[in-house]
């Protein structure tokens, strides 16, 4: 069985549960549902991934997620950095829309700025269905040295936490276990 970790040298977690409440997460899920129902999602990506930059939306709720992500990045790096690009999207999936997980491995190292020195990615679990049987395996699977190597691990999902890792790290969604929707907020930041 693939191991499950909370943190390690690749992945760090930052707790914002005192700032971002479960009610905030539910409000964010409602906004994402509306975006999806309006058809604003990619058809060539896993179902359903929003097209727009969620961090650019004007609802006040996104300020909490945006600023907590930025702070998490600074903490991961141990310093402030000049940000050249920051974006976020949401991913909503369930058993009815589940795809072949072998096809879902990816990384986010696609710099938009030629001066980019680094990129970090983050995941926030907006909602994990309450009927999931094995929560440890419904989060995110990481392959730190590539998908063909044996050092893969799952990151245990925690409510109210950002999970931060290098943007070039291969990863894929965890095992879908429910007909109810799992919602995540994913984010990338490029820095100089």
Where do the protein language model's features map onto the residues?
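Catalytic core of non-heme Fe(II) oxygenases with the double-stranded beta-helix
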Residues: 79-175, 180-184, 190-191
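Non-heme Fe(II)/2-oxoglutarate
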Residues: 1-82, 88-89, 102
